[in-house]
Curated annotation (Swiss-Prot):
Source lineage: Eukaryota, Metazoa, Chordata, Craniata, Vertebrata
Protein name (database record): TBC1 domain family member 10B
InterPro entries xrefs: Rab-GAP-TBC_dom (IPR000195), Rab-GAP_TBC_sf (IPR035969), Rab_GAP_TBC_domain (IPR050302)
Function: Acts as a GTPase-activating protein for RAB3A, RAB22A, RAB27A and RAB35. Does not act on RAB2A and RAB6A.
Species this chain originates from: Mus musculus
Gene that this sequence comes from: Tbc1d10b
Top-level lineage group: Eukaryota
Compositional bias segments (type: Polar residues): 693-702
Keywords noted in UniProt: Coiled coil, Cytoplasm, GTPase activation, Methylation, Phosphoprotein
């Protein structure tokens, strides 16, 4: 064998030059290919022509006219002609050896000229795969990179075959087109080293052709077995994806599946897996960025600015709310103004769900009906409602992480709530405006709690809003239009002139409680005040929006027709929807429950005169949590130790409970300050049961002077506070009247100026016309006589 110069080595990297970046790992391709044991790349130098042999092919023996050498035997090259191949290790190879590899060779891209025969040459692009670390999962690429070197089917043995255990290669001689020229000696597989060294013999034995080329073979690790394989392409943003190799895509796909396949996030999934992957994907495209409210890609209508509260202030508010929860009945009955003030400041996010349940009294409703929601959920619903509900699920906040996925847990819980309500209230059924309301509740609390909160909204806060015919919302539209006449006469006059019915723009506002209109920060603040103060807040918010949209002459100049006005109402100004501005305007607007009830009576009377009786008669509307609390106390009066056992309310309540089959309440627990224990109740035969028994009353005969003085003081303070509140309300009404008067004067002044301007324009047009007629008139008489009387009158007129 001829001896030549030393083996070629890779040129050193320049000082300060960064190493070439490693591309992402690529797994093995389907079909026949060469594989070796996992580990770092191994570079082997051989002096024989190289060809690829697939695993399982019979390794040919040495034929006459060829030279058999060991893959691990280092050889020298006589010229700069080398061959670069990228191979993969065989899983059958022993996994006991680890080989270090230079970092400079990792990820190198080399252009190789392969000579498949002695006469023809083909040039192919070979991309060497980087070496993943231990435990790094590999993935099977979906398509083959252009120009990648692939393993061919087994070929017939040719002269110049090099056989090695675990790595078998064949190839011809080629010129190096680019890349690192490297030749290192390494052992691939378990090839026994030939102690005899290079083989040299007489003609007819295995000899290397001259000049001897150097074939540099880079071996990449093989993929893990299929059992431990995990496909990274199907991994969603919230959890692991579907394990297993990539399967062939089906011939027919749904629209969502096809979109997901095009976006590269969906493979052929089993039938029991959602095509959306996870709840944080929209149409198969994972969106990891969410705002603090859970909206993907930013908050709902993110153009508004959100107010930031210092952390210490937020913690203090949380402690105050927790203290109120511990004595809730006391706070509602005695210090409701403080509760209302704290609701207007904003309920802390961590306690908002609990506060909504306490304010609406849905917590007590849930405790009184244990297992009722599960019973309604198991019942069979009306198919006509269930079909409509299922169609509306994907329309509710599609950019929120709870409802982004088709069939996700958010849509499933929403379906359960709406279905249960149709069974709980079969006379009302389902209204499409209930879905966004239930969705907002689901964002803050579990399904069962959200259901009872929805029941309270539909029964106590907005009765009749979601019934057939929508008569209650039409009646409230008339009430709203009457209140608008007081709050903003200019907007009221414009809407009446354009003949725009209130139902055209306020239906979505009222029925969805502005959940689909305002920025999300403002929506939560409005809902906080709504649960505390009732429907009055909805009227106030709508009046503020209209006053700041159509309440001035400058704003009405762009709303000359009905279309322009409706377009303006669909695109409300951002300033009036901003959280702090909106809350400030709503709290200062002088619209009370008395106004609403007075207008309700007047509009109901007009309705009966023009349209007849209401088809659906809802229950009485309650204005906020205090009214709900007082109604609950009236329906269930507390039995204290001083109450008579034979009093009429007590007998009625006991009789009603006996008829209903409910167990009688336990006797009241005696306290230390309750006084002496009453003796046996003595009832004469002729004593009427409505009269209290003298022996059953354990109330002390008199109270101390200190207690009476404190009670009088408390009553006096309450009266003073009520007077102050009335005075402030009158002052606000006076200021509002002054503002309306000023607006009317401004409007009159502008109308006067407009008339003057039009008058001046008409005068100017008249002068021009007069001069034109003089110039176009007949020429003056040559004899110097006077003009005719008609001509004189014409000039005098103009």
């Amino acid at each position: 064998m001829e001896t030549g110069p030393a083996p070629l080595v890779a040129p050193p990297r320049r000082h300060g030059a960064p190493a070439a970046p490693s591309p992402p790992p690529r797994g093995s391709r389907a079909g026949s290919h060469l594989v070796v044991e996992p580990g770092p790349p191994v570079t082997t130098a051989t002096s024989a022509p190289v060809e690829l042999v697939a695993p399982g092919e019979a390794r040919p023996a040495c034929v006459p006219g060829s030279s058999q050498t060991s893959a691990s035997t280092p050889t020298t090259a006589t010229s700069s002609t080398v061959v670069m191949l990228t191979l993969e290790a065989s899983p059958e190879a022993a996994k006991t050896q680890e080989f270090p590899a230079p970092a400079a060779e990792t990820g190198a891209e080399t252009s190789v000229a392969l000579a498949l025969g002695t006469d023809t040459q083909k040039t192919e692009e070979v991309r060497a795969s980087p070496v993943p670390g231990p435990g790094t999962p590999t993935r099977t690429p979906s398509r083959m990179a252009p120009g990648a070197l692939t393993a061919k089917p087994p070929l017939a043995p040719k002269p110049g075959t090099t056989v090695a255990s675990g790595v078998t290669a064949r190839g011809g001689v080629g010129q190096v087109a680019g890349g690192h020229e490297a030749a290192t000696s390494a052992s691939a597989g378990s090839v026994p080293e030939d102690p005899s060294g290079p083989v040299t013999g007489p003609p007819g034995t295995c000899e290397a052709p001259a000049p001897t080329p150097v074939a540099v073979v880079t071996v990449t690790p093989a993929p893990e077995p299929v059992e431990n394989f995990q496909d990274l392409g199907s991994t969603s943003s919230l959890g692991p994806g579907i394990s297993g190799p990539r399967g062939q895509a089906p011939d027919t796909l749904s629209y969502l599946d096809s979109v997901s396949l095009m976006s590269g996030t969906l493979e052929s999934l089993p039938d029991d897996v959602s095509s959306m992957g996870s709840d944080s994907e929209i149409n198969g495209m994972a969106l990891r960025k969410t705002d603090k409210y859970g909206f993907l890609g930013g908050s709902q209508y993110s153009g508004s600015l959100e107010s930031s509260i210092p952390v210490d202030v937020a913690r203090q508010r949380e402690l105050k709310w927790l203290e109120m929860f511990s004595n809730w009945d006391k706070w509602l009955s005695r210090r409701f103004q403080k509760v209302k003030l704290r609701c207007r400041k904003g309920i802390p996010s961590s306690l908002r769900a609990k506060a909504w349940q306490y304010l609406s009294n849905s917590k007590e409703l849930l405790e009184q009906n244990p297992g009722k929601f599960e019973e309604l959920e198991r019942a069979a619903g009306d198919p006509k409602w269930l079909d409509v509900i299922e169609k509306d699920l994907h329309r509710q906040f599609p950019f929120h992480e709870m409802f982004a996925a088709r069939g996700g847990h958010g849509q499933q819980d929403l379906y359960r709530i709406l279905k249960a309500y149709t069974i709980y209230r079969p006379d009302e059924g389902y209204c499409q405006a209930q879905a966004p309301v239930a969705a907002v509740l689901l964002m803050h609390m579990p399904a069962e709690q959200a259901f009872w909160c929805l029941v309270q909204i539909c029964d106590k806060y907005l009765p009749g809003y979601y019934s057939a015919g929508l008569e209650a919302i039409q009646l409230d539209g008339e009430i709203f239009f009457a209140l608008l006449r007081r709050v903003s006469p200019l907007a009221h006059r414009h809407l009446r002139r354009q003949r725009i019915d209130p139902v055209l723009y306020m239906t979505e506002w009222f029925m969805c409680i502005f959940a689909r209109t305002l920025p999300w920060a403002s929506v939560l603040r409005v809902w906080d005040m709504f649960f505390c103060e009732g429907v009055k807040i909805i009227f106030r918010v709508a009046l503020v929006l209209l006053r700041h949209t159509l309440g001035s002459v400058e704003k009405l100049r762009s709303c000359q027709g009905m279309y322009e006005t409706m377009e303006q109402l669909r695109n409300l100004p951002q300033q009036c929807m901003q959280e702090d501005f909106l809350v400030h305007e709503v709290t200062n607007l002088p619209v009370t429950e008395a106004w609403i009830e007075r207008e309700n009576a007047a509009q109901l009377k007009k309705w009966r005169e023009t349209r007849g009786e209401l088809q659906y008669r809802p229950s009485r509307r309650l204005h906020g949590s205090r009214a709900i609390h007082e109604e609950r106390r009236r329906q269930q009066p507390p039995l204290g130790p001083s109450s008579s056992l034979l009093s009429l309310p007590s007998l009625k309540s006991r009789g009603s409970r006996a008829v209903g089959g409910a167990p009688s309440p336990p006797p009241p627990v005696r306290r230390a300050s309750a006084g002496p224990v009453p003796g046996a109740v003595v009832i004469a035969e002729g004593l009427h049961p409505s009269l209290p028994s003298p022996t059953g009353n354990s109330t002390p005969l008199g109270t101390s002077k200190e207690i009476r003085r404190q009670e009088k003081e408390r009553q006096k303070q309450e009266k003073d506070r009520e007077k102050e509140r009335q005075r402030q309300e009158k002052e606000r009404e006076r200021q509002e009247k002054e503002r309306q008067k000023w607006e009317k004067e401004q409007e009159k002044e502008q109308q006067k100026q407009e008339k003057e301007r039009q008058k001046l324009e008409k005068k100017g047009q008249g002068r021009k016309l007069s001069l034109r007629r003089r110039a176009d008139g007949p020429p003056a008489s040559h004899d110097g006589g006077d003009r005719s009387a008609a001509e004189a009158r014409q000039d005098a007129y103009f």
